[in-house]
Amino acid sequence: MNNKKILILGAAESGVGAAVLAQKQGFEVFVSDNGKIKDNYRKMLIEKKIPFEEGTHEGAAKLIAPLNPPLRGDLAQSSNVALPQSPPEGDLGGLEIIKSPVIPDNVPLLVNAREKGIPIISEIEFAGRYTDAKKICITGSNGKTTTAMLTYHILKNAGLNVSLAGNVGKSFALQVAEENFEYYVLEISSFQLDGMYDFRADVAIITNITPDHLDRYDNNFQNYVNSKFRILQNQTKDDYFIFWSGDEVICKEIEKREVKANLLPFDLEETDDTFAFTKGDQLIFKQIVLSAITGKSEKQQITKSTNNQINNNQQTNQPYMTMELENIAIKGVHNLYNSMAAGLAAQVVNIQSDKIRRALETFDGVEHRMEYVASVRGVRYINDSKATNVNSTWYALESMQTTVVLILGGEDKGNDYAEIADLVRKKVRTLIFLGKDNEKLKKFFANFENKEQGTKNKDSLSATNNKIKIIETKSMQEAVDAAYEVAKHGDTVLLSPCCASFDLFKDYEDRGRQFKECVIKL
């Protein structure tokens, strides 16, 4: 039995997975969840004989601040189920906390632990200690789920022994405990990165960085940026960093930091530095001279020159792969960026070009991300519930070729709606606010006027200069019913909320499912 004790805060996918892995590694484990544990996770804890509590953090607090006499009776009394085995004793020696990413760092329990010098880490950090698999890690403000799932799709269809984990798919820790994969594609949020210290990404991807979750970062954008760049913190000269070179925030951060990994930028336009770009109607990937990650061939040195510009030594101009843009399965400029990032990651792990091309042509997309639901009375309904920040909604609106009825709102995260103001004026007929508190939205969008230029539907806004209609709703059914009433033939009803979902829904998935259910019933 390992002498270290593991306290896990949060008994959902990541927490229970971490508990199973910790138990397998011989640690004493105790799981604490302040809410109600879902039946499937409770069943797993009981079957594995892992002690836990729910509806309280009382037991967890006692482990952090040990009391006498021993805690078993107190813990069992505070739990909603009998403990299958004794919880860890209240000795701080060797205690480590693995916390759910949804728990803020400033809750008193964690503040107390930090003051006592108790390490607090994420499930990703913990699981990374116990696998030698190659890890392709994706973060960013937008596009990380699509990029992760597309990368997984390419690798899986190429025959690699690969799994999907992190912020999507099954728990990384549970898979490390029970499976033996050679590759992991990990979507990693900023909250997960905040609890990562020694974890090393063999391939790191940052899709983009725009303001998001600022309420968790003291409303300081640089704090959020620093969190995203933690994905690079332990990379070496044998690793790779894939990024969009059109993102000014990312490029400025690269100039400020010592990035040891090979740099693989991509953009719409070709430069001397880009490894993926478009030319006419073609998507083009340049050849990468592979490094130690695949053990195949001589490493390509890609470094920064003294003037902080990206400098590619030994770069070949020979194309690795080309394909017609119209054959890429997922549409829109944002998905073109996602395809470039995933394609470069696949090339790094030595996937043949024809397999990358075929996978890009067959990927079905991600549920709740620009997902087509149905057409009713000549109106298309699109579910973009995963758009929980302004930049995501910007990309959604930018891709629209018709007049839009836009459903937005929810739990504001310090949003600056000015980023979508021009697109709203050009493309939106009606704004439908969906949330408990719509005051910030109403104040910003009051008196907006249509200035549409060139939509394809026959009832174009360009003939008028009308004030954009605003409708307030408090449920998804109300929002969909309102959209049905105001949308005209040829319009698109777009659910792209800009905001978190927790004011009215369990999560963005619940919000998206309710939208689809309401649309199907029209």
Q: Where in the sequence are the language-model features?
A:
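C-terminal helical cap/extension that packs against the catalytic core
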Residues: 38-46, 421-490
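N-terminal leader/targeting and accessory segments in enzymes
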Residues: 1-68, 74-84, 91-122, 126, ...
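Nucleotide phosphate-binding/pyrophosphate-handling subdomain across enzymes
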Residues: 2-5, 15-25, 300-303, 323-429
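Beta-strand->loop->alpha-helix junctions that form or flank phosphate-binding loops
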Residues: 53-57, 121-125, 260-278, 359-361, ...
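Short internal beta-strands
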Residues: 28-35, 241-245, 407-408, 427-436
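Intrinsic disorder/low-complexity segments
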Residues: 60-95, 287-322, 447-468
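Phosphate-binding loop of NTP-binding sites
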Residues: 4, 23, 84, 101-261, ...
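Extended acidic/charged loop-beta regions that coordinate divalent cations
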Residues: 56-59, 178-216, 252-308, 312-325, ...
